[in-house]
């Protein structure tokens, strides 16, 4: 989608939809929001809706960073402690590696 062909109101509406969609456990939408609207929020000449778009982009970045930290923490803990959890670790695993760590 070429954002240059879209009105400023429509840009704001689309940015807001991606921001709200990220709360449905879809942090990828926040990443898309950051990439699509960063230039509009911070590099484009000033216009009325720009401050709101800037807020949505900042909050999307914070939300995405939060999700990355949470997921990285969970993956690290799971990889380290899965064998110690016994049956629960096996139950949570999609594939069970052979052997012992």
UniProtKB/Swiss-Prot annotation:
Gene Ontology BP terms: amyloid precursor protein catabolic process; amyloid precursor protein metabolic process; amyloid-beta formation; membrane protein ectodomain proteolysis; membrane protein intracellular domain proteolysis; Notch receptor processing; Notch signaling pathway; positive regulation of endopeptidase activity
Among the entry's GO cellular component annotations, what is one? gamma-secretase complex
Pfam families found in the cross-reference section: PEN-2 (PF10251)
Intramembrane runs of residues: 18-36
Its subcellular locations are: Endoplasmic reticulum membrane; Golgi apparatus, Golgi stack membrane; Cell membrane; Membrane
Q: Which GO terms describe its molecular function?
A: endopeptidase activator activity; enzyme binding
| Residue ranges of the TM segments | 58-78
Where does the source fall among the domains of life?
Eukaryota
As recorded in UniProt, coiled-coil segments are none
- Give ranges for the Lumenal compartment: 79-101
Which regions of this chain are Cytoplasmic-facing, per the record's topological domains? 1-17, 37-57
User: Which of UniProt's keywords are assigned here?
Assistant: Cell membrane, Endoplasmic reticulum, Golgi apparatus, Membrane, Notch signaling pathway, Transmembrane, Transmembrane helix
User: InterPro entries from the xrefs?
Assistant: Gamma_Secretase_Asp_P_PEN2
Give the way it sits in the membrane.
Answer: Multi-pass membrane protein
In which family does this protein belong, per the annotation? Belongs to the PEN-2 family.
- Quaternary state and interactors: The functional gamma-secretase complex is composed of at least four polypeptides: a presenilin homodimer (PSEN1 or PSEN2), nicastrin (NCSTN), APH1 (APH1A or APH1B) and PSENEN.
Task: Give the protein's function.
Answer: Essential subunit of the gamma-secretase complex, an endoprotease complex that catalyzes the intramembrane cleavage of integral membrane proteins such as Notch receptors and APP (amyloid-beta precursor protein). The gamma-secretase complex plays a role in Notch and Wnt signaling cascades and regulation of downstream processes via its role in processing key regulatory proteins, and by regulating cytosolic CTNNB1 levels. PSENEN modulates both endoproteolysis of presenilin and gamma-secretase activity.
| Name of the featured protein | Gamma-secretase subunit PEN-2
The organism of origin for this protein: Mus musculus
